[in-house]
């Protein structure tokens, strides 16, 4: 039961992404290398960059399991994503692997004006439904270069924007989807 009504009956209210929880949350400039960042809890992220931090990540592994409990929050705000950039942060990821095997676990998600994620020379693989590769909403930006992105679940585009405000760029990317309703590129 949510909001006093059975699941699916009450309208869902999007929450403020600044309240999201995660395994690793970075709020100041930082460099990270050769790290394993995982999360197995519903509605949490493996990694969150926030507070206008500039974060450089190399040769690391990110993994997420644990299904979302709110489609709206995971689709539009980035809750339950593997890597989430908010509050004008800039996350630069190189030479890494990003995977998820849970519903509503987008791999790389930027939301909010000034939030930018640059991903290069990285493999991305999502296995469950509503789990996109690169996703941006509310004026967030994700730039990809030399990527292999594979999605297996339904409604899991490799490149996606939503809410009419989001920017994705992809250069030298191999993009593969196999789930129902999963175009390679999706934008609204």
For the regions a language model picked out, list residue spans one by one.
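Extracellular beta-strand/beta-solenoid scaffold signature
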Residues: 7-21, 41-48, 70-84, 102-110, ...
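All-beta strand scaffolds that present successive hydrophobic residues in beta-strands
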Residues: 15, 26-35, 54-59, 90-95, ...
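N-terminal segments that cap or nucleate solenoid repeat domains
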Residues: 1-71, 92
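...the same signal can extend to comparable exposed beta-sheet modules
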Residues: 113, 141-143, 150-152, 164-172, ...
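Beta-rich extracellular carbohydrate-active architectures
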Residues: 36-39, 61-67, 97-100, 123-126, ...
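Intrinsically disordered, low-complexity segments enriched in polar/charged residues with Gly/Pro
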Residues: 32-35, 69-71, 84, 95-96, ...
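Surface-exposed, polar helix/loop patches in the mature regions of secreted/periplasmic/lumenal proteins
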Residues: 91-125
